[in-house]
């Protein structure tokens, strides 16, 4: 306040002094008047003066205005005037600054008044509570005032809102306001609120902000919408950028799928307004936020897959190949597609299949490379195409092979009708444009990145330089152009290509050294004292020569490792060589290129280093320095140690693979045993069901037997005499047929039981075979279950035998009944009995016989079903027994293999112990010779011992199993 009063006191007297008195009177009226109308009029007058006399109103009226907000909440009009006045005091409008021509000291009034306002945190809480009012004259000024506070002192206001109860939730309600002015200003408020505050970003996201913002964008027409769409997209970027939690929530909420309609740009003639270009640019940037290389790899990969599955990548490729797209949108689309496919094999394969709508159709990669090597294309577009090509080849050995194959003689189109990617890269590599040379060299280096196979394949490429001359290899042509002294950008690109090509590829090093002019050229370049511009080239030449030493397999006697180091010491000097090598990492553009993969340069002359190449320099600089200072004896000892360790590693790897295979076999056997257990449980359940069914059949049979006994006792001679009506003989004949069928079924059942007996005997013999004691616990459990199953089958057999005996008794009783029937058929009817009584008895007997026949049929059907189920059980037992026998044989073989493996592992441990002793003696010799033993060697030997211990433990566990 003293500062503000000092500013006010420094102003000239005159009319302003009169206005100051007026403001003082108005403030007194606001503070002392008891009538609401008087206070309202006074606040309205302060509002009208607040823009022109911002300082005076702010100093004298701020406390009174805050008091009005606290005491007069019931009157929306005075609250609105007070909020507008505070907004005019705190905000810094550009027009206001132009009108006032204020000094730098007065330009800071907004932040000063903001600091006074938020000094009491209750003022911000009061403002948040006022935003709950639905009245337009209260809510809208409140939104503008809070937005201005956030713009002035964002972090402080954010912290107050964060600790305020339901503070963020109240602000989220603004997005649901039906009045567009409040909703749109609410979006601006949330922009300022979420800027650089991860905690608030998470709260806003979980308050359903994504859903509401996407709804607003859809309602406004997606990319064809107005500035509201732009504001929503900026807010979405604030919520998602560098916020892994919100990115995962956005993906899990299936919001990526809702982004696809954004890129449906429509017809070519629909036009591209400035707002549409801005909106689409922000939409593309939002996609890039989700798949940025700076995100965790897992999150980026999941978003890339989701974009392919929902068709978003396909839609982006459609824009990429469309005509009439503005240059900046096309450039940003290329960058977006680049990061969507980077490191994702599925997306990279799809991009390789995209064709441009030309006649004949050409792959999109070829069309993009044509733009990259065309010097008439914009620089930014060429950088974007290079980035797209790099992302296509990133961790994509399949794509690298396809690009290199277009350079090989067998795949080149002899007719010349089509242009391949390899031809375009070669054309750019040897063109007169230095930028095309650099881009083509870097692109070709990415085709060789971490791919030794393609490095060897590229050695086969032959170039026809001129008519009548023999073809020259691509490697030789690169060195020829390098020695011709072209532009620095061209030489840097070629040196980066050669360094990438020769690293980790001894065959390529041999081909490079085979040309006798290469080594003298490199040593000459390094030894010269050139200007600062040539120091980078000298450093790259030193790196290339160091790679030729470090990855040299000594296959050429002329350029063995030791001879090359002697050559460096004589012509250059080791210290000078290391100093020149350090020029690379000390270059000002090196650190800039190492920060991010995208080649983003302000102008072509800054295009010197590639991101992946900086990783290679960081990896090789130290090892090359050590290799230069090592003596020949140390090299020999190191090579011997390396060979020994490689042999040990191969042996250990072999046994690890063997143990891994045995573990897999054990897992398979365990799975098979568990499957057999399940099958046995199912069989046991089936047997239990069969036992219950047999019991039911037995009960039905007993009931039928009782009923037949009652019929034979109670019907007497009347039933026998009723056989003369002509109906009973037919039923009796049918009953005889049914009995015959029962006999045949019984015989069939007995034969099946005999087969089951033989099966049980086979099972017993298999269980008594040698080697039973060596079976695993899981197999023993199966044997117990099979034994239980045998007992159940034996019980089933006894029950079926008893049923057969009972059926035989039933047949005997039926025969007796038939005999009685035939005997009475010959006798005459009893005299004195009427025909009506005889007919009634006959009908009763017929009904009883019909019921008997029906029950007999049901019994027959149930016996048939039982027979079929027994057959199925037999088949399942057969398959189970055969499987158990096979498993037993395999387990015996596996135990023999495990025993052999344990013996081999013991031999290996002895061998490793001997080698450890040799390594220890070598270290002692080195110490005696005065050479320090490096810590890395000790760590490596320690790691080797740990691996040996782990292998020994694994072997013990395997033997125990």
Curated annotation (Swiss-Prot):
The modification Phosphoserine is found at residues 50, 941. Residues 642-929 form a coiled coil. GO terms for molecular function: identical protein binding. Pfam families: Arm_vescicular, Uso1_p115_C, Uso1_p115_head. It is a peripheral membrane protein. The modification N6-acetyllysine is found at residue 202. Keywords: Acetylation, Coiled coil, Cytoplasm, ER-Golgi transport, Golgi apparatus, Membrane, Phosphoprotein, Protein transport, Repeat, Transport. It is found in: Cytoplasm, Cytosol; Golgi apparatus membrane. Residues 934-955 have a biased composition (Acidic residues). Phosphorylated in a cell cycle-specific manner; phosphorylated in interphase but not in mitotic cells. Dephosphorylated protein associates with the Golgi membrane; phosphorylation promotes dissociation. InterPro entries: ARM-like (IPR011989), ARM-type_fold (IPR016024), Armadillo (IPR000225), P115_Arm_rpt (IPR041209), Uso1_p115_C (IPR006955), Vesicle_P115 (IPR024095), Vesicle_Uso1_P115_head (IPR006953). One of its GO terms (cellular component) is ER to Golgi transport vesicle membrane. Residues 1-641 are annotated as: Globular head. Signal peptide: none annotated. Its main location: cytoplasm. Residues 764-782 have a biased composition (Polar residues). Composed of a globular head, an elongated tail (coiled-coil) and a highly acidic C-terminal domain. General vesicular transport factor required for intercisternal transport in the Golgi stack; it is required for transcytotic fusion and/or subsequent binding of the vesicles to the target membrane. May well act as a vesicular anchor by interacting with the target membrane and holding the vesicular and target membranes in proximity. This is General vesicular transport factor p115. The lineage of its organism: Eukaryota, Metazoa, Chordata, Craniata, Vertebrata.
